[in-house]
C-alpha cells in the first residue's frame, strides 16, 4: 500500500530557505515520492499552475518547509496557501504550520520559551496520522514563535502544555506540525510523515 501511495503521489515542496528542507527531500525520495522543489521566491501562481497540470497524472500535495522569521516574511507561501486551500492537500512544518494557522485567522506570537534543537513529549489523539505511534511522542522543536487564538475551523490534534503542536482542517485537507518530523530527534518521524501524506491524499484518491 505504501509503495502504491508513493508512486501515485507528487509532492510540491516550498523551500523557505531552511537547512531542514534537505532532510525533507531525502525523506521523500526514500519513500519514492515524485518531488518538485520551489524556493519561496517563485510566483505562487506559477507553482499553482504546475500543481494543476501535475494533478492530471497523479495525486498532488503541497509541503511547506520550515524556515526563519514569520509567515508573512516567507515570500509566496501565504498567497500560495490561499490559492491551494480546498483544492489540494497541504502539509506545513514549523513555519509552514504557522502559516496555515494564520491563513485561517489565528495569531502567531512569540513563545514564552525559545526551543532550538530540543525534544518535547507531545500528547496526541492516537488516530489518523498518529496511529500506532508512542503516547506521548518525543518530537524535535526549533521555534521561537507559536500559534495562538486558534481559529474554530482548525482542530488541535497534538499539544505540549498550551502550545498547539499539530492542527488540521479536515475538509480543506490542511495539516500543520509545529515540530519537525524529519529530525532524528522525532521518534518514528518517517512513519509519521508517511501516515500524514496517506491521510491527506486518502480523500483525493476517492474523488
What are these regions (language model features)?
Residues 161-203:
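A glycine-centered loop/beta-turn motif at secondary-structure junctions
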Residues 39-40, 110, 141, 158:
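Short loop/edge segments at beta-strand edges and connector loops
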Residues 1-88, 95, 187-188, 194-207:
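N-terminal beta1-alpha1 cap of cysteine-dependent amidohydrolase-like domains
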Residues 94, 143, 180:
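Histidine-centered divalent metal-coordination motifs
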Residues 128-171:
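Catalytic beta-strand/loop cores that center a nucleophilic Ser/Cys/Thr
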Residues 58-131, 138:
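Cysteine-nucleophile active-site neighborhood
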Amino acid at each position: 500500500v505504501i509503495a502504491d501511495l508513493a508512486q501515485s503521489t507528487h509532492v510540491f515542496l516550498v523551500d523557505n530557505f531552511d537547512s531542514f528542507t534537505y532532510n525533507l527531500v531525502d525523506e521523500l525520495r526514500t519513500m519514492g515520492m515524485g518531488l518538485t522543489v520551489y524556493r519561496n521566491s517563485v510566483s505562487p501562481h506559477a507553482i499553482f499552475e504546475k500543481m494543476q497540470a501535475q494533478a492530471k497524472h497523479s495525486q498532488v500535495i503541497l509541503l511547506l518547509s520550515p524556515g526563519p522569521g514569520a509567515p508573512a516574511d516567507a515570500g509566496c507561501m501565504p498567497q500560495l496557501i490561499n490559492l491551494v486551500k480546498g483544492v489540494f492537500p497541504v502539509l506545513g512544518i514549523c513555519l509552514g504550520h504557522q502559516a496555515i494557522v494564520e491563513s485561517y485567522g489565528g495569531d502567531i506570537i512569540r513563545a514564552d520559551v525559545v526551543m532550538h534543537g530540543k525534544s518535547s513529549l507531545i500528547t496526541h489523539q492516537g488516530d489518523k496520522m498518529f496511529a500506532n505511534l508512542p503516547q506521548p511522542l518525543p518530537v524535535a522543536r526549533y521555534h521561537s514563535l507559536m500559534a495562538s487564538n486558534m481559529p474554530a475551523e482548525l482542530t488541535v490534534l497534538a499539544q505540549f502544555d498550551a502550545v498547539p503542536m499539530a492542527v488540521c482542517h479536515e475538509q480543506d485537507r490542511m495539516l500543520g506540525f509545529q515540530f519537525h518530523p524529519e529530525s532524528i530527534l522525532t521518534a518514528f518521524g518517517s512513519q509519521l510523515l508517511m501516515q500524514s501524506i496517506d491521510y491527506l491524499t486518502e480523500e483525493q484518491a476517492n474523488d
